[in-house]
């Protein structure tokens, strides 16, 4: 695994957590819109099979979302621990890129470096991470 692949693990884990959250919210919205019954007629108190299945599906989506969030937290901490010890501008560039998930343009503004300057620093920082991963 290269240094860049290692550092990008958090971005991927965060993306997966957002996907699971969106799926959960979509399912919740669908259940809410389908389960409304406003015809005024009594329907009994038994939970119907479709309602039970929908609740189980929703619970499964919620569990997947929470597990993905926990994974993202674990991966973020692992990446953060690697970056934390890197001093100077190299550490700051890595932190902004791989922990705060900033775009290159935002990093240039934050550290007051040109695009090329930030990429040179990033290249040096990746070499430091690569040496620590071995």
Map each language-model feature to its residues.
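N-terminal interaction/assembly modules
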Residues: 1-82, 106, 133-134
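DNA major-groove recognition helices of helix-turn-helix
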Residues: 114, 118-132
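Short alpha-helical segments used as structural interaction elements across diverse proteins
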Residues: 73, 94, 117-121
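N-terminal positioning helix adjacent to the helix-turn-helix/winged-helix DNA-binding module
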Residues: 75-78, 86-90, 121
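Helix-turn-helix DNA-binding module
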Residues: 100-117
